[in-house]
């Protein structure tokens, strides 16, 4: 829901700096990378590098040049620390200690755990809620969209490339749009299916235009951030308005808690500090903190779907 929006805010802010940060602008860093590439990334030296590179590193797409950048990043960080200076960023990111092929280990693991939580709750939902429940198809579709987004988040934090970055951004946008569609179906779509269908078509059109513009014309981080934040805030406000209108329902407090928790946890994204132990930064902490929120939201969807099923069955009996 709105938590994905906060994540996009951080990503957009970091990406805006990606063209040049203090660390990668340092002559010592640039000279180090240049010398490393000349020494290791051509001819026989390159063959030697490839022969000793672990298979998981090559499968993840780590090149000789990438390895040079990684090693020179730590050389530069060491010099900064020796001089008593603050740790610099490189290409818009803090320096992270690589583990195996994982570029940002904590965020990658946290993204995987978020996806695992979504998968477990999807299985529980499908076991507990009959397919005849009015919200069943929409909730199941939302779960699959979320799983796909967390998969690409895991991939992106494992290996940051242009492709994985775009897939992470686009899939996050898809989750936000599907969440607001889920809200539309729950609030007005069950009574007015045609309205929900029209809204779905509009959202698909918006997503297509959004992805096409960013992919084919210009990858504008500021526009991407503004668009997703606007939709995310509308989504949160819509859910809260529905909760206020239906506060008599015993399970509504779960939805309120989810929206408020996500808004509160989003403040973690405003923290910006070098990774603790070169692994754990504010973004990773935010990812970790959202795991129980997914469990709570799917618990709400399960309770609400069973409530709607019971209500629809009662109407059939009355008819």
From Swiss-Prot:
GO terms for biological process: GPI anchor biosynthetic process; GPI anchor metabolic process. InterPro entries: Per1-like (IPR007217). Residues 24-101, 157-169, 222-224, 279-281 are lumenal. Its EC number is 3.1.1.-. The chain crosses the membrane at residues 102-122, 136-156, 170-190, 201-221, 225-245, 258-278, 282-302. Glycans are attached at residue 40. It is a multi-pass membrane protein. Disulfide bonds: none annotated. GO terms for molecular function: hydrolase activity, acting on ester bonds. Its main location: Golgi. One of its GO terms (cellular component) is Golgi membrane. Residues 1-23 form the signal peptide. Residues 123-135, 191-200, 246-257, 303-319 are cytoplasmic. It is found in: Golgi apparatus membrane. It holds the Pfam family Per1. Keywords: Glycoprotein, Golgi apparatus, GPI-anchor biosynthesis, Hydrolase, Membrane, Signal, Transmembrane, Transmembrane helix. Involved in the fatty acid remodeling steps of GPI-anchor maturation where the unsaturated acyl chain at sn-2 of inositol phosphate is replaced by a saturated stearoyl chain. May catalyze the first step of the fatty acid remodeling, by removing the unsaturated acyl chain at sn-2 of inositol phosphate, generating a lyso-GPI intermediate. The fatty acid remodeling steps is critical for the integration of GPI-APs into lipid rafts. Belongs to the PGAP3 family. This is GPI-specific phospholipase A2-like PGAP3.
